[in-house]
């Protein structure tokens, strides 16, 4: 992959991340608390913190990526599948960063 191709990959990923958050915020968050669903998830999860809940949700995507990697190079996933799984993992890492920073702010 050339530098120019990688820059294009980055821009597409950033755009997709913003698009995903715009859509999902209406479903899982409020203007007052973007992490509301993770805080409510504490009651449904085996974890006792919103960060633990987010990590649990993220692990599903990490496991999927691990499976994709284990099948390479013989079986290469579609771009659509790869972009979805990598994007979901990135999104959960951003959420985890925000949750941890929010805890430090309180």
Show where each model-derived region lies:
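Intrinsically disordered, low-complexity regulatory regions
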Residues: 1-106
């Amino acid at each position: 992959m050339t530098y120019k191709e990688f820059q294009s990959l980055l821009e597409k990923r950033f755009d997709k991340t913003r698009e995903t958050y715009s859509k999902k915020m209406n479903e899982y968050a409020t203007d007052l608390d973007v992490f509301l669903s993770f805080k409510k998830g504490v009651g449904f999860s085996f974890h006792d913190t919103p960060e633990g809940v987010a990590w649990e949700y993220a692990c599903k995507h990490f496991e999927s990526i691990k499976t994709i990697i284990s099948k390479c190079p013989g079986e290469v996933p579609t771009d659509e599948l790869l972009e979805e799984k990598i994007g979901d993992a990135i999104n959960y890492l951003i959420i985890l960063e925000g949750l941890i920073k929010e805890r430090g702010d309180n």
